[in-house]
UniProtKB/Swiss-Prot annotation:
<comment type="function">
    <text>The small GTPases Rab are key regulators of intracellular membrane trafficking, from the formation of transport vesicles to their fusion with membranes. Rabs cycle between an inactive GDP-bound form and an active GTP-bound form that is able to recruit to membranes different sets of downstream effectors directly responsible for vesicle formation, movement, tethering and fusion. RAB18 is required for the localization of ZFYVE1 to lipid droplets and for its function in mediating the formation of endoplasmic reticulum-lipid droplets (ER-LD) contacts.</text>
</comment>
<feature type="binding site">
    <location>
        <position position="17"/>
    </location>
    <ligand>
        <name>GTP</name>
    </ligand>
</feature>
<feature type="binding site">
    <location>
        <position position="34"/>
    </location>
    <ligand>
        <name>GTP</name>
    </ligand>
</feature>
<keyword id="KW-0653">Protein transport</keyword>
<keyword id="KW-0479">Metal-binding</keyword>
<feature type="short sequence motif" description="Switch 2">
    <location>
        <begin position="63"/>
        <end position="80"/>
    </location>
</feature>
<keyword id="KW-0256">Endoplasmic reticulum</keyword>
<feature type="binding site">
    <location>
        <position position="125"/>
    </location>
    <ligand>
        <name>GTP</name>
    </ligand>
</feature>
<dbReference type="GO" id="GO:0001654">
    <property type="term" value="P:eye development"/>
</dbReference>
<keyword id="KW-0813">Transport</keyword>
<feature type="binding site">
    <location>
        <position position="40"/>
    </location>
    <ligand>
        <name>Mg(2+)</name>
    </ligand>
</feature>
<dbReference type="GO" id="GO:0016324">
    <property type="term" value="C:apical plasma membrane"/>
</dbReference>
<keyword id="KW-0547">Nucleotide-binding</keyword>
<keyword id="KW-0551">Lipid droplet</keyword>
<feature type="lipid moiety-binding region" description="S-palmitoyl cysteine">
    <location>
        <position position="199"/>
    </location>
</feature>
<dbReference type="InterPro" id="IPR027417">
    <property type="entry name" value="P-loop_NTPase"/>
</dbReference>
<feature type="binding site">
    <location>
        <position position="22"/>
    </location>
    <ligand>
        <name>Mg(2+)</name>
    </ligand>
</feature>
Length: 206
């Protein structure tokens, strides 16, 4: 455990098969992109430490298969999570339509009601868009989620998605526990009104 790490957070990435969950994870953790990346079998897991507004957090990021046959993994997968990234493909409307199913699953299996959710519309680098940005934003607002559009291929919005999610988690009292409570760690906050950090207008904090 690093002495300067404020906390360790469990982050989940969920969504239909083929929406780019693993690609987003690899872009964020390893800064790589593989257009031929195979579908996840079961659960993948990566760890990355980031600093948000002066607060360093270690992220344990779980990437799960979107296929129905792997749903038996669900209960243990959701247990203890503080943040969820729900991904759809902006070029496949069916993945957007099925977001409600994923939210229902989240409500069923999540062990707490103050979990922070981020909606990500992936693959904005492609031209054959079927889901408008405003549709994603409207859905996110309806369900009190953070929202961003991104591209794992070009890296647009990827870093921002994780940073905004972590920032919101840290700002939520009781959602996480400090691993340095006896070391006098002081939680720092971004100045009020400073706005979207490095998002460049991508993120909407709702």
């Amino acid at each position: 455990m690093d002495e300067d790490v404020l906390t360790t957070l469990k982050i989940l990435i969920i969504g239909e098969s083929g929406v780019g969950k693993s690609s987003l994870l690899l872009r964020f953790t390893d800064d790589t992109f593989d257009p031929e990346l195979a579908a996840t079998i079961g659960v993948d897991f990566k760890v990355k430490t980031i600093s948000v507004d002066g607060n360093k957090a270690k992220l344990a990021i779980w990437d799960t298969a979107g296929q129905e046959r792997f749903r038996t993994l669900t209960p243990s997968y959701y247990r203890g999570a503080q943040g969820v990234i729900l991904v759809y493909d902006v070029t496949r409307r069916d993945t957007f339509v099925k977001l409600d199913n994923w939210l229902n699953e989240l409500e069923t299996y999540c062990t707490r009601n103050d979990i922070v959710n981020m909606l990500v519309g992936n693959k904005i680098d492609k031209e054959n868009r079927e889901v408008d940005r405003n549709e994603g934003l409207k859905f996110a607002r309806k369900h009190s989620m953070l929202f961003i559009e991104a591209s794992a291929k070009t890296c647009d919005g990827v870093q921002c998605a994780f940073e905004e999610l972590v920032e919101k988690i840290i700002q939520t009292p009781g959602l996480w526990e400090s691993e340095n409570q006896n070391k006098g760690v002081k939680l720092t906050h971004r100045e009020e009104g400073q706005g979207g950090g490095a998002c460049g207008g991508y993120c909407s904090v709702l």
